[in-house]
């Protein structure tokens, strides 16, 4: 009997909203599935942005979400294989999220091994997939710490603007702290510049600034994700960029990111 390898778990993380985190999680996941990989996406954000973007427009109506599964883990209840997992037409699976996750984050504070509850939920799934991608909440609270404790690597999308670049320091300190105290194997996959505009001097300056400040310590992906109206539309259509605008520059960018780095 062939034993499948354990999935690589990637936390897509930035404590700042609007950096292209959900878009990256969705399109990297579908891109990997197009390469023949088995992919599980996990919406770890109470806003449920990834769930909505994948086509489940009313996350609050879903009977089982990440919150349900984490609550079961906290209560030492058995989680049957595949429970709560939704199947998307583009070949990826999803553990959805909704606002209940915000209440669960509060409950985590008084839980034993509170940083590792999400890891408990995902450990059984690691044998079934090649990649697990976590779309993290835009904060550095207990849910994000849980995601980092469950991850092998982190991917940091950064919008190509100065303030977004400034917030990187705090995020990197959190990653280092989790590595030191909870998950010594945690690596930083790299920084992905999103919503770039290479036609402007300002866009090029920010690109150079981030590469200059961090490039010697952390990989900054050569591939950047350009700003695009079509990419902004995908959360409303329930499809990835590969279905919505397959010949566009954003689809090409995510295709290149996937092929070159995974």
Task: Tell where the protein language model's regions lie, with residue ranges.
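P-loop NTP-binding core
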Residues: 1-262
């Amino acid at each position: 009997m062939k034993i499948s390898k354990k999935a690589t778990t990637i936390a897509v993380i930035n404590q700042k909203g609007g950096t292209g985190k959900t878009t990256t999680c969705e399109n990297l996941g579908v891109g990997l599935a197009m390469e023949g990989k088995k992919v599980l996406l996990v919406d770890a954000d109470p806003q449920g942005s990834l769930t909505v973007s994948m086509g489940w427009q009313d996350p609050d109506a879903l009977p089982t979400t990440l919150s349900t599964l984490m609550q079961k883990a906290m209560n030492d209840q058995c989680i049957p294989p595949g429970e709560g997992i939704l199947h998307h037409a583009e070949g990826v699976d999803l553990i959805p999220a909704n606002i209940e996750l915000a209440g669960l984050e509060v409950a985590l504070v008084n839980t034993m091994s509170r940083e590792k509850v999400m890891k408990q939920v995902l450990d059984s799934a690691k044998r079934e997939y090649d990649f697990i991608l976590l779309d993290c909440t835009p904060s550095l609270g207990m849910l994000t710490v849980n995601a980092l404790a469950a991850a092998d690597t982190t991917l940091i999308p950064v919008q190509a603007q100065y303030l977004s670049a400034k917030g990187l320091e705090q995020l990197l300190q959190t990653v280092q702290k989790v590595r030191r105290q909870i998950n010594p194997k945690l690596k930083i996959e790299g920084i992905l510049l999103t919503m770039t505009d290479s036609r402007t001097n300002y866009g090029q300056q920010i690109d150079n600034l981030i590469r200059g400040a961090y490039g010697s310590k952390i990989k900054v992906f050569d591939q950047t994700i350009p700003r695009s109206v079509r990419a902004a539309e995908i959360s409303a259509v329930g499809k990835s960029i590969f279905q919505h605008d397959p010949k566009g520059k954003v689809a090409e960018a995510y295709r290149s990111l996937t092929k070159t780095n995974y």
